[in-house]
Every structure is written in C-alpha cells, then in structure tokens.
C-alpha cells in the first residue's frame, strides 16, 4: 500500500510540473495585466464555510475529524474561502480584483472509487462590483486568458441563473425541483411525461428545455414567452451584457446562449458560463464561473450582501487540451553547464566555479557532477541530456581536457 498514492490521488513528475507551471505562469501574467492581485487562503476550512449556507453539498467536501470546535474540510473550490477572507478583512466597498492558483479537493460521487479527488485551478474573483461592466470584464478576461494560452477553437456557453430560476418559478412549486433535475440531465422524455396540472405548465417546461442555441435564436424564443416584471428586467440586463461584450471587439468568437443550464453550485445569482473545447473525440471543460451576489452575506457578521463575480480555470483540462494541440514543451529545460572536477583535489574549486556561473547567468541551469563517472560516461550523459557545455575544473579553476 505504501508504494502507491491513495486512490484518487496522483503524483506529478517534472515534465508535467513544468508544463503546468507554464500554463499557470501565463495565466497569472494575464491576471496581473488586468489589475488582479494574488490571494492565498487556507486549504483547510470549517465545513460551514465550505458549504456556503447549503449552496455546496457537504457530500462534495472531503471532511476531516472534528477539531472540538466544529467539523473541518478540504476546500472543493476557492470562491467560498475567498469570500470569507474578503468580507471579514477587506470590506471597504471598493472593487477588489483577486486571483489565485491552488489545489482543490472533491469527494467523488458514490460508486466512483478511485476517481481523481485533487485538482488544480487558477482563477479570479471580482468582488464589491455589480453591474453589466463587471460581468463583461469577467467574460473578456476569460477570453484573453485562453487566447494567451494559444487556444482559439473553444466555445463559451452562457446562461443566467437568476433568469432561469425566475422562469422555473412560474411552474407549480411541487414540480420545480423535478423539472430542474430533468433539464440538468437533458432528459426530455421524462420532462415531457411529468404530471403537469395543465398544458400551459407543460409547454413552459418544454420551452425552458429548448432555451439553448445562438444568441439570436434564444432571444427570439424568449420573446415568445409571456415575460413580466423581474423576468423582463433580467432579459434586458442579459441583452445589455451581450451588446457590451460584442462592442468590445475582443469577446469569444463562438458563444452559445443556454438559459436551461444551471451550475452545480447553487450560489450563482446571475450570469453563469463554461468554456468548452472539443479536440478529436474529447470534450474539455476549460473553465467555469458566474455571478454570486448573495454569497458574501453568508460570512458577514451582519449578513450584509455584496456583489461578486469570477471564474476558475481547470489546469488539468487546459493541460490535456494543449497537449493535443502540441503547444507544450515535450522535455524539461536542459542543463546549460555541467561542472566537473578533474580529480578529488578540485572539489572545492568546482563548487566555487559552479556558484560563480549561477551568479553570472541567473537564468541558466548549472549542474554539478557528484563523481563516480569517467570522462567518457560524462560525455555520453551530456549528449543524452542535451547539456549545453561541460566545464572541467582543476584545483586552480577551469581547465581544457
């Protein structure tokens, strides 16, 4: 058992680490250009913090022993932890642009023993900022992130949790949860066979199922519904967002509007979205996010609400997608200098010269030979590892062999 990681865990070897570090570094540079600052929150949180007032199922959380003050868990996502940190320590009501790179942990569904439990994400949160401009910034930043990574063939699936819930609220309360479940599972057959009180309710449920397609198609279908009050306002806001993103000239090239789609985490109150890429026979969910205007109140001492929005990018999915495209390095960075003593009397001089090279060339890799290999073996090793130069060192400094 000790020879392998536990089920659901895995090790990352140097090449994969280097590839994912490149992805992370490019994302952090993009976040920085947009004015976002990095925040680091605890991997370990109170379970009550992680479930976000019931918006996240406790079954998703890997829970630890009771500390004596309450149950603990490993974060299944970052938004709740960041919301808790910001609302208790950064509440000056000014827009806070925060970014992160971190691991998250999720219990696999029942019956999926051995399924991956640790994931890596990078993302941003824009807090204390409501309105269409903030939502547009999020979508445009997401687009910029994927563009900087060299991804062009991807699709943005955009929904609106608030609008979808408002439409669901027109159905009988006893059917709302079942209709939502059918729509989430894309089960049209079961949806059409539910015990509706009348044809009007059934037609509305089936129309909700069909609210996905191009922007023009979905807005046209919305126009045929009898929308009033809150629904009309939410549609106007959605149209304003779409217009602003289009007017920027830098929005996603392929946008699908899906008002039947709901995120698995229930704290979203406005726009929700996924970035998806299809490569060969694989479909990759590159990232997801949305607006959550009620979440921060869960952590405020007086339950005061503040707006928030953001997204997370899935490093594993990005990594697999970029591997298929062939845009990631296929080997680790080579050694630039292999520094070798000519004999035992040169050991001290070898260490000194290696350190001198590191100071002179801080971006270069300098490796020290630790002995036990002949000059011929060192030359063979250097060729196999694409070493830039072997430096031989005698007691008085570098020498030619």
UniProtKB/Swiss-Prot annotation:
Keywords of this entry: Amino-acid biosynthesis, Cytoplasm, Histidine biosynthesis
Disulfide bonds: none
Protein localization: Cytoplasm
Domain of life of the organism encoding this protein: Bacteria
Single annotated GO MF: histidine-tRNA ligase activity
Pathway: Amino-acid biosynthesis; L-histidine biosynthesis; L-histidine from 5-phospho-alpha-D-ribose 1-diphosphate: step 1/9
One GO-annotated biological process of the protein: histidyl-tRNA aminoacylation
Cellular component terms per the entry's GO annotation: cytoplasm
Matching HAMAP family: HisZ
Note: This function is generally fulfilled by the C-terminal part of HisG, which is missing in some bacteria such as this one.
Protein name: ATP phosphoribosyltransferase regulatory subunit
Gene transcribed to yield this protein: hisZ
């Amino acid at each position: 058992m000790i020879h392998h990681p536990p089920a659901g865990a895995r090790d990352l070897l140097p090449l994969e680490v280097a590839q994912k570090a490149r992805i992370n570094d490019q994302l952090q540079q993009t976040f920085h250009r947009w004015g976002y600052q990095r925040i680091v929150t605890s991997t370990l949180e109170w379970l009550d913090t992680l479930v976000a007032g019931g918006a996240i199922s406790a079954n998703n959380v890997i829970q630890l022993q009771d500390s004596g003050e309450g149950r603990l868990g490993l974060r299944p996502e970052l938004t709740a932890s960041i919301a808790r940190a910001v609302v208790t320590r950064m509440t000056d009501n000014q827009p806070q642009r925060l970014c992160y790179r971190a691991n998250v942990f999720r219990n696999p569904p029942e019956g999926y023993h051995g399924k991956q439990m640790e994931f890596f994400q990078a993302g941003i949160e824009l807090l204390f900022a409501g309105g269409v401009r903030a939502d547009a910034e999020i979508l445009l930043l997401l687009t910029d992130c994927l563009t900087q990574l060299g991804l062009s063939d991807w699709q943005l699936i955009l929904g609106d949790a608030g609008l979808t819930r408002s439409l669901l609220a027109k159905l009988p309360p006893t059917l709302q949860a079942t209709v939502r479940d059918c729509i989430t599972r894309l089960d049209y057959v079961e949806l059409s066979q539910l015990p509706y009180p009348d044809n009007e309710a059934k037609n509305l449920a089936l129309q909700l199922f069909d609210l996905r397609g191009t922007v023009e198609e979905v807005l046209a279908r919305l126009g045929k519904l009898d929308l009033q009050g809150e629904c009309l306002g939410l549609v106007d806001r959605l149209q304003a967002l779409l217009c602003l993103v289009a007017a920027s000239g830098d929005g996603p090239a392929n946008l699908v509007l899906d008002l039947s789609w709901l995120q698995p985490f229930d704290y979203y109150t406005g726009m929700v979205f996924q970035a998806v890429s299809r490569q060969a026979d694989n479909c990759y969910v590159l990232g997801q996010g949305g607006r959550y205007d009620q979440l921060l109140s869960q952590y405020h001492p007086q339950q005061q609400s503040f707006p928030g929005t953001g997204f997370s990018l899935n490093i594993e999915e990005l990594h697999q997608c970029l591997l298929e495209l062939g845009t990631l390095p296929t080997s680790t960075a080579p050694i630039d200098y292999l520094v070798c003593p000519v004999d035992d009397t040169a050991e001290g001089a070898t260490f000194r010269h290696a350190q001198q090279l590191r100071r002179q060339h801080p971006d270069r890799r300098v490796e020290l030979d630790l002995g036990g290999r002949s000059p011929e073996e060192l030359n063979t090793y250097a060729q196999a590892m694409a070493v830039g130069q072997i430096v031989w060192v005698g007691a008085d400094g570098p020498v030619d062999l």
